[in-house]
From Swiss-Prot:
Described function: Together with the chaperonin GroEL, plays an essential role in assisting protein folding. The GroEL-GroES system forms a nano-cage that allows encapsulation of the non-native substrate proteins and provides a physical environment optimized to promote and accelerate protein folding. GroES binds to the apical surface of the GroEL ring, thereby capping the opening of the GroEL channel.
Subunit structure: Heptamer of 7 subunits arranged in a ring. Interacts with the chaperonin GroEL.
Superkingdom in the source lineage: Bacteria
Name the record gives this protein: Co-chaperonin GroES
Entry-linked InterPro entries: Chaperonin_GroES, Chaperonin_GroES_sf, Chaprnonin_Cpn10_CS, GroES-like_sf
Length: 96
């Protein structure tokens, strides 16, 4: 299935995090944090400004990003893979 986000939306696949503590203890359940890093899979055409022009997004497909998982982030399962759909505003940084 192909999916194309609209406007300033971005589709991100969450990167797995190490589920061990610094002391080597395996963390489970609520002790294991969900990663706030991911890889951009698809981007919309851009944000529509008040004057009607489209401002392209700063992120692009393949970027590794750090994001804030907030109320606007939606989790979906596409082709058996869990992805996050979010606004570019929820992305805090691009990891280079």
């Amino acid at each position: 299935m192909n999916i194309r986000p609209l406007h300033d939306r971005v589709i991100v696949e969450r990167q797995e995090v190490e589920s061990k503590s610094a002391g080597g203890i395996v963390l489970t359940g609520s002790a294991a944090e969900k990663s706030t890093r991911g890889t951009v899979l698809a981007v919309g055409k851009g944000r529509i400004l008040e004057n009607g022009t489209v401002q392209p997004l700063d992120v692009k497909v393949g970027d590794s990003v750090i994001f804030a998982e907030g109320y606007g982030t939606k989790s979906e399962k596409i082709d058996g893979k869990e992805v996050l759909i979010m606004s570019e505003n929820d992305i805090m940084a691009i990891v280079e």
